[in-house]
């Protein structure tokens, strides 16, 4: 029905192109007039366009700066502040509207200018990544259409070989005229550097500056790159710079400008494939004993896994024996279902599933236990030591498994019993027979026991995942004594990336390599929320249409399919389906041998290192020369890809040969039918399959593509084989037989769609959780940036003081404790405040608060008069920044802990997301209270020290510098890791050229409390966890 409607009214993409066509006609009209202009007059055109755009925007920028400056006035009332904030927001909106209007106005002339520039550069030679390249590109009409789509803030889907890199020059040049900076985001640093060097002549011809962000650059180099009109870099480099800017100790250390316009190359890879893994800057966990912990528990897990394997073997024996006598026996089906739940990748089990009727039997038994919301599934799992859910990527330890591990640990079931901390602490407090010291000791024991057991349970869970869900040469490889993650979408080794939450350490223990130390989160943001910072976002890729709904729902990005310059001549064949992998591999090798005999180049796409090496061994046995491109051979990637289109070439590649590469056909290959693409299995994402097909048939070249599939492939086994198995059973297929039908291909695509929907749900859920943190992050980072950019922060300090005075006065009035009030004010503010006990009882707390505010204000005023204004400014900034950084780190740790356990609330019929929002809000309110309290305390107690004490301060700063360098930037699951540059990142130590800063402690007249004593402030916490935390 939809196809009939599209034929009558035209498709969405046809309508999109129809709207753009008049602009393309106008561009070409102007382009025809530029040819006759001499070089100088032509260059002046670019200068004139830039001046026209800037003249329109400068008045808005001036007004915005004036308003921002007014907001910094220390004597402003709250009402004036709110009014100016609204005015500023309106100004910024008008600024964005004016920017869009002027750029739309000059678009035809600018695009024509870029096109003519490309024509004038033809024949010129440039060095790109060390190679000489002759410029031979002038944008076609379809490329002009792509450029317009990108400028409009949409995603342009363009087929392989259609020149996406050249297309980007058009909107990049146009938007760079604003002077606000344009970011071009690539999937790796090689492409960032290459594209910058390749396209730079177009920009430099008209005086636009270019820069690139690479790992390892120092802060000043990064800042200079961001100050350029156009900046290239990877999504992780841009994201980490944003996080580091919000950890900076001074405004001079920040490197980024405002977020105006970003064009994301391979947008589906960046915004979808990478979106499940948040960017994290982390630091080492002090006193972490990771190695011992994992080494100690590893033997238990190995014994548990062996016990499960033996159990599975027994179940398979029972099922095989029973099925010989009773082909459709329910108990045999139940045994096989237990095998599926206990060891789903068992080769013997997978082979059994290809036998007639077996798959159907297992499915029918599983459906029986899945009735009533899976209420009976525990009956299946209870016989196992643990249950594996491959689809959800989770493992559930059963009661039988817990008993097994309990005996190995000599703790029986106690290992899995976490003490109820709240009730046990309350019981200790209520026990009148215990002395205060005994209470402290018993409380410590409860906390220690809880910490040890929860830590052990976490380690057990991660080791079990490492042994059952993560396979060497599939999810990761081991190289040079290190566990290296393999990107499932590109097949590339992700150098330096690490799995989070202790999983990487568990895999390191499994593979007997060095176990790296654990880390804690210092700053984090998801890819989705980072790119939402930009005023305008656009992207380009060869494969976006299948994810159009996700792009719109998450990023509000429309997808427009750009027509090709030449019709696609590639022939895409229906899939060939075999029963077993062995049959499929034999068929692939035979097909490669057939193609190689006539000289037609063939690219064999695989989903893992293991499969590529298996096929390579089989081809070697047939004496067929070939190249292998996988995570272990990536160093020769450019050389191998360059040769893949030559006559007689045979290339086996994981998904690596997909992005940023063009395979050009050698002499005589077109006549043979072009490049032949042979997929060894379907990927779980249709986009990756389309990327592989797209290697052939570029720019109208001939080509062919086909996928070979078996029922043992993970995708078919998990999501799509039921109908296909039924068809094969009915047709009575024998070994070696193959099914080829469009119905089968459609069935496989439906299976892929299921996986895509599941992955979308995961990414969407991640975003819903991170939206909570995003709101909190914005509040904290806004406070931090304000503190960095403003001069004196006295007004803010005085506001905090007023709140503090009323809070403590009310608290101690309620308990009628004037001595407690005096002691707390002395300890927290270093202010001596005295109040008569009789007057304290008579007066309302407001009067005490006013007296306290007056005394504290006078103390602060005396401090101001005794110190230069510059030093007071640094004291106030240090108070705000150091407290925000410390408390925000602690808050992130608490949020991590909350996230880890929040899903358990579902067992209590509660929505984990709703519970998470409520709990996170409570934690955030407490965080803000603590930040305000601590900031005030530090601002009052911070004083310059004498020269005699400066050596100790310098030593502390050196220790901090060492800790600072140990911070790393990484994805939660996997992203680039490298040391922070020495002159970048957080500067939590206040540096003064002449003086040093230290917190002045009040003079004590009573005995100092011990580390484990109750804190004298009355908080109920131990001294070491409260006022003594920094000692």
From Swiss-Prot:
Q: State how the cofactor is bound.
A: May bind 1 zinc ion per subunit.
Enzyme Commission identifier(s):
7.4.2.8
Chain residues that bind Zn(2+):
1015, 1017, 1026-1027
Reaction(s) catalysed by this chain, per the record, are:
ATP + H2O + cellular proteinSide 1 = ADP + phosphate + cellular proteinSide 2
What is the membrane topology listed in the Swiss-Prot or TrEMBL record? Peripheral membrane protein
Q: Name one GO cellular component term.
A: cell envelope Sec protein transport complex
Looking up Pfam families in the UniProt record yields: P-loop_SecA, SEC-C, SecA_DEAD, SecA_PP_bind, SecA_SW
Give GO terms for biological process.
intracellular protein transmembrane transport; protein import; protein targeting; protein transport by the Sec complex
Cofactor(s) this protein requires: Zn(2+)
UniProt-listed Gene3D superfamilies:
Helical scaffold and wing domains of SecA, P-loop containing nucleotide triphosphate hydrolases, SecA, preprotein cross-linking domain
Keyword entries, A-Z: ATP-binding, Cell inner membrane, Cell membrane, Cytoplasm, Membrane, Metal-binding, Nucleotide-binding, Protein transport, Translocase, Translocation, Transport, Zinc
**GO function term, MF aspect, one:** metal ion binding
**Which superkingdom, per the lineage?**
Bacteria
Q: Subcellular location, in the record's words?
A: Cell inner membrane; Cytoplasm
- The disulfides recorded in the entry are none
Identify the residues that bind ATP: 143, 161-165, 662
Q: What is its main location?
A: membrane
- What does this protein's UniProt record list under function? Part of the Sec protein translocase complex. Interacts with the SecYEG preprotein conducting channel. Has a central role in coupling the hydrolysis of ATP to the transfer of proteins into and across the cell membrane, serving as an ATP-driven molecular motor driving the stepwise translocation of polypeptide chains across the membrane.
Q: What's the family?
A: Belongs to the SecA family.
| The protein's assembly and partners | Monomer and homodimer. Part of the essential Sec protein translocation apparatus which comprises SecA, SecYEG and auxiliary proteins SecDF. Other proteins may also be involved.
HAMAP family linked = SecA
Designated name of the protein: Protein translocase subunit SecA
